[in-house]
Amino acid sequence: MTLPEFFGCTFIAFGPPFALFVFTIANDPVRIIILIAAAFFWLLSLLISSLWYALIPLKEFLAFGVVFSVCFQEAFRYIIYRILRSTEQGLHAVAEDTRVTDNKHILAYVSGLGFGIISGMFALVNVLADMSGPGTMGLKGGTELFFVTSAAQALSIILLHTFWSVIFFNAFDTNNYIHIGYVVFSHLFVSLITLLNANELYTTTLLINYLVTILTGVLAFRVAGGTSRSFRKFITCQ
């Protein structure tokens, strides 16, 4: 059963992001480059977080590392925002589809998905490697829900990073500091809540994280200009 669980959890975590990539990014080279660049910047934030966690006192407290990791991620989200905004004219000149620069929310969406995919991969890839077989006993006989929960958490963080970038980029464009604060503090909140998984409170963390994901998705939809009317047209394929 290890191999079916491996594929099941892989599709739970990366199925929707892969579909987003195929249908909205894969046919545009500029979007692919932006996605890869965003993933690279997230890796830089992870590198700095690792160095900080290794060198600074209090590193025995995991929450300490989580807080600074979130701060570094948001700092690099701002850096890529500044880079994309400063290179819009160049992107417009080389882009086959000019919507990528004409609609600023597309840049935010693509970079956010890049952030999310690489974050989800680093969160889940070791777990996927362990579940692919052969079967092993947990050190303390952990619950069988661990793998599915990890996959669901990874999907949540991928979607959240996508939504956060849409909100974050627009907030700086419009000087909306409330939305900037929402992105930073909801990222902190979701990350710290996952620490409860150490006590096997999986139901609690999943419910809270997906509630935040839904609320953040609605906010990102409204920020991007979505309305209830446009949502109904989307659902009914009009």
From Swiss-Prot:
Specify the species.
Drosophila melanogaster (Fruit fly)
Q: What is this protein called?
A: Gamma-secretase subunit Aph-1
**Which residues constitute the signal peptide according to the record?**
none
Question: Per its database record, what is this protein's job?
Answer: Essential subunit of the gamma-secretase complex, an endoprotease complex that catalyzes the intramembrane cleavage of integral membrane proteins such as Notch. It probably represents a stabilizing cofactor for the presenilin homodimer that promotes the formation of a stable complex.
| Oligomeric form and interacting partners | Component of the gamma-secretase complex, a complex composed of a presenilin (Psn) homodimer, nicastrin (Nct), Aph-1 and Pen-2.
Q: Does the keyword Membrane apply?
A: yes
**Organism domain of life:** Eukaryota
Topology in membrane = Multi-pass membrane protein
User: What GO terms fall under cellular component here?
Assistant: endoplasmic reticulum; gamma-secretase complex; late endosome; plasma membrane; recycling endosome
Q: Where in the cell is it found?
A: Membrane
Q: 4Fe-4S among the record's keywords? A: no
Gene behind this protein: aph-1
Q: Name one Pfam family in it.
A: Aph-1
Transmembrane region(s): 6-26, 32-52, 53-73, 105-125, 152-172, 178-198, 201-221
Alphabetically sorted, this entry's keywords are: Membrane, Notch signaling pathway, Transmembrane, Transmembrane helix
Major localisation? membrane
GO biological process terms held by the UniProt record? amyloid-beta formation; membrane protein ectodomain proteolysis; Notch receptor processing; Notch receptor processing, ligand-dependent; Notch signaling pathway; protein processing; protein stabilization
User: Which InterPro entries does this entry report, sorted A to Z?
Assistant: Aph-1
Q: Name one GO molecular function term.
A: protein-macromolecule adaptor activity
Q: What protein family does this chain belong to?
A: Belongs to the APH-1 family.
